[in-house]
């Protein structure tokens, strides 16, 4: 195993500090980082996309697990530290300077890949929903292992009838299986955020037949955009939606948070042309 200096020493030597503008919070606990890297299963020889590696804490753990990592980092300050990691693990790490929201992962890999990332808080949900919303399914990614604020993680795995249940839960669960792999105390980060965090692990599931992902997005956007209103109000602007409720025997006086993921899929199926 490659001997590496302590991560804190690397951060101090390169004068790195987490910036709020980039949504950064660094993890230094190597045991925790190794545990996160084990969540996707065996990664030896597997392609892994990491977004926002910062000084390379999780990157180290992924490399130690034998992964072939492609890391996208927009903070120029972190590039020298990542270059040192690339030298320590020849042929295993590729670093791309850029904005992950503007880079299509499909252009980076010849085959399937995993995503493992302590996502910057300010773009985490945007990236996550982007990975979930592809029209082609199953996707080219094999799994997503992502750090989120605990509140967001709970929204991803939420069940109908709960306060956390909403559009994010439906989009995450209708053709994938998300779970909270572990919770992470705020004290594990430098600087400590104001909230707790959690690791979400997602694997693709079978695609329901006859349903357009785009239509499901439209249905959930309308329904949860006015979540306190009855469906007859929130969905009235979506052509055919009220007829779909009648066909399915769904009471239009119900509210969006009472419908199951399967209910939303059924509505979208009837509206898919």
Swiss-Prot record:
Q: Where in the cell is it found?
A: Cytoplasm
| Top-level taxon of origin | Bacteria
This protein's major location comes to cytoplasm
Please give the InterPro entries that the UniProt record associates with this protein. Answer: KsgA/Erm (IPR001737), rRNA_Ade_diMease-like_C (IPR023165), rRNA_Ade_Mease_Trfase_CS (IPR020596), rRNA_Ade_methylase_Trfase_N (IPR020598), rRNA_adenine_dimethylase (IPR011530), SAM-dependent_MTases_sf (IPR029063)
Per the record, its GO cellular-component terms are: cytosol
State which Enzyme Commission number(s) the record gives: 2.1.1.182
Matches recorded under SUPFAM superfamilies: S-adenosyl-L-methionine-dependent methyltransferases
Q: CDD domains this protein is in? A: AdoMet_MTases (cd02440)
Please give the catalytic activity noted in the UniProt record. Answer: adenosine(1518)/adenosine(1519) in 16S rRNA + 4 S-adenosyl-L-methionine = N(6)-dimethyladenosine(1518)/N(6)-dimethyladenosine(1519) in 16S rRNA + 4 S-adenosyl-L-homocysteine + 4 H(+)
* GO MF annotations, alphabetized: 16S rRNA (adenine(1518)-N(6)/adenine(1519)-N(6))-dimethyltransferase activity; RNA binding
A Pfam family matched in the record: RrnaAD
**Which residues make up the binding site for S-adenosyl-L-methionine?**
25, 27, 52, 73, 99, 118
Has the keyword Cell membrane been applied to this entry? no
Q: What keywords appear on the UniProt entry?
A: Cytoplasm, Methyltransferase, RNA-binding, rRNA processing, S-adenosyl-L-methionine, Transferase
The answer to whether UniProt assigns keyword RNA-binding to this entry is yes
Member of which family? Belongs to the class I-like SAM-binding methyltransferase superfamily. rRNA adenine N(6)-methyltransferase family. RsmA subfamily.
What does the UniProt record say this protein does?
Specifically dimethylates two adjacent adenosines (A1518 and A1519) in the loop of a conserved hairpin near the 3'-end of 16S rRNA in the 30S particle. May play a critical role in biogenesis of 30S subunits.
The UniProt entry, under PANTHER family, shows: DIMETHYLADENOSINE TRANSFERASE, DIMETHYLADENOSINE TRANSFERASE-RELATED
Q: Which protein are we looking at?
A: Ribosomal RNA small subunit methyltransferase A
Say which species the protein is native to. Answer: Novosphingobium aromaticivorans (strain ATCC 700278 / DSM 12444 / CCUG 56034 / CIP 105152 / NBRC 16084 / F199)
Q: What is the lineage of its organism?
A: Bacteria, Pseudomonadati, Pseudomonadota, Alphaproteobacteria, Sphingomonadales
Q: Which gene encodes it?
A: rsmA
């Amino acid at each position: 195993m490659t001997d590496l200096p302590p991560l804190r020493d690397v951060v101090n030597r390169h004068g790195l500090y987490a910036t709020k503008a980039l949504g950064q919070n660094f993890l230094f606990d190597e045991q925790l980082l190794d545990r996160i890297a084990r969540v996707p299963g065996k990664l030896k020889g597997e392609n892994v996309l990491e977004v926002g590696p910062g000084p390379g804490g999780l990157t180290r753990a992924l490399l130690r697990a034998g992964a072939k990592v492609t890391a996208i980092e927009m903070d120029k300050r972190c590039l020298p530290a990542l270059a040192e990691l690339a030298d320590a693990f020849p042929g295993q790490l590729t670093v791309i300077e850029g904005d992950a929201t503007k880079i299509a992962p499909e252009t980076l890999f010849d085959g399937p890949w995993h995503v493992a990332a302590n996502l910057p808080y300010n773009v985490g949900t945007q990236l996550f929903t982007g990975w979930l919303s592809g029209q082609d399914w199953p996707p080219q990614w094999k799994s997503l292992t992502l750090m989120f604020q605990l509140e967001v993680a709970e929204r991803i795995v939420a069940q109908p009838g709960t306060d956390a249940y909403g559009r994010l839960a439906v989009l995450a669960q209708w053709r994938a299986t998300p779970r909270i792999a572990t919770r992470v105390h705020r004290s594990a980060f430098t600087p400590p955020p104001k909230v707790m965090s959690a690791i979400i692990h997602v694997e693709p599931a079978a695609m329901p037949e006859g349903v357009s992902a785009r239509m499901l997005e439209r249905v959930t956007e309308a329904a949860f955009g006015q979540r306190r209103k009855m469906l007859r109000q929130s969905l009235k602007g979506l052509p055919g939606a009220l007829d779909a409720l009648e066909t399915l025997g769904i009471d239009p006086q119900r509210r969006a948070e009472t419908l199951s993921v399967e209910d939303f899929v059924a509505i979208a199926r009837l509206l898919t042309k």
